[in-house]
Amino acid sequence: MSEQKLALNEYLKTDSDYLRGTIKEGLDSAVTGSFSDGDQQLIKFHGFYQQDDRDLRNERKEQKLEPLYSFMLRARVPGGICSPQQWLGVDKIASTLTSSNSIRLTTRQTFQYHGIPKRNLKTIIQDLDREALDSIAACGDVNRNVMCNPNPVESKLHEQAYAVAKQLSDHLLPHTRAYAEIWLDEEKLLSTEDETVEPVYGKTYLPRKFKMAVAVPPDNDVDVYTNDLGFIAVAENGELVGFNLTAGGGMGSTHGEVETFPRLADDFGFIKTADVMKFAEAVMTVQRDWGNRVNRKRSRLKYTIVDHGYEKFKAEVELRAGVKFEPKRDVVIGDRGDRYGWVEGVDRKWHLTLFIESGRIKDLPGQTLQTGLREIAKIHKGDFRMTSNQNMIIAGVAAEDKATIEGLARKHGLLGQVLTQTRGHSIACVALPTCPLAMAEAERYFPEFIDHIDALQAKHGISEQAIVVRMTGCPNGCARPFAAEIGLVGKAPGRYNLYLGASFEGTRLNKMHRENIQEAEILAELDTLFGRYAVERDAGETFGNFTVRVGVVKAVIDAAKDFHG
């Protein structure tokens, strides 16, 4: 019987000499702005994707020119924390080495650059390195940027949780020296060509991307259940004692293919802080060994758990960790939004959360966000914290410095805008024109769409109710649309699938209500539902729970069985 053929990416990884491929040769070639097909997969492990301007694609084709290739580079910033000095370096790169002249905060607490010509890639990575930043494993079949609730109010508990997130990120980094050799001109050592180069990953790394998050209850801004692996902090008397571990979440799916589906993670039990690395490595290596390497659409950990079964997976993780799970501790998971404006922490320091629409930091007439953050960074003595809602926290401000920081924020349009509850809880992915997977607009259209939502809520007298709204240009789910009370997922230009019924806290998925509809139909549908919600809701009932209770959509209990059913 012939051996089952693996996905193409598996052969590329095996033959890449631990992610080197021919990236260096492709970088040196001035004949094209592109990398080879194989290297386009490998460069993801180095933190960037090849893209082109889709707005110009047809025009350039008519001119017999290759697409206007550029690159999106994503940094690795565990927990989203960087210093003001680092931010100044990040800002300078955006202003001098990218065509977008902007910084994009992501839904995973880091930043990315768009519009990088190939010739500038090495310079950018070297400039980031000078700021003690990198893009290693920000993309690819590895552990991605580790999220951690930025919770600056409970400073001691956050500090402890952040230390775990940082340790997870560092411990599970690829060991290959390919990044240092190609981008930082480190001298190449003789390749050992054995598994000791990557003691955790091996030559073929993971079957697919792997995402981790550390949540600090009651906040669930990191959407912990949407991650492959989650750690929900458990505290006693303000001290971190361990975590409830979750595994098997993930948002991506494919339109029309019912064997693919989003899924929220399962609860596995409580683990002590000292055992976090053992369990993280155990979960990752089970996925490494059991994950599907034949069909990449079924390669995420969520499918591994579904296919092998919860109990079998749990037993194998305990075996590899050498420790058994304890019963999960009772914790309360609550709001997924950010605390906007000034908040005082237990350490008497102040923290200013700034709303950044769709995470895009750019200077526009009347709203010079990029300049404003630059000016704040020049005088700020604390740190900058990126949130998973694509916002920025100016953290650790002394009381005597508040007025100066606030003055700069207001001067540059970072503060003072009218912000509804729903807009403050809503996010969108980048989509067009740069993302090659996008089928419809997201970031460019989303502010206008939220204007319509705000108007409908005002019409029905429900503006005080925060509703989690998310939009993506495709079903890959970068803005976690399947965990939104109202999720819009691009199907074609100007057309979206409308999903309803997720819980406000992020503990239940939504379900498709209408397929492939345009703005007018979406708004008409929501107009009717908001009208019903205004008069039929129970006290304190959220919109997502309402749509399930009154039968607009059925609750998704087991995504493998009922997300599509």
UniProtKB/Swiss-Prot annotation:
Binding site for siroheme: C478
Any one Gene Ontology cellular component term annotated for this protein: sulfite reductase complex (NADPH)
UniProt keyword 4Fe-4S present: yes
Cofactor note as given: Binds 1 siroheme per subunit. Binds 1 [4Fe-4S] cluster per subunit.
Residues the entry annotates as binding [4Fe-4S] cluster: C429, C435, C474, C478
Family that this chain belongs to: Belongs to the nitrite and sulfite reductase 4Fe-4S domain family.
Identification of the protein by name: Sulfite reductase [NADPH] hemoprotein beta-component
Biological source species: Shewanella baltica (strain OS223)
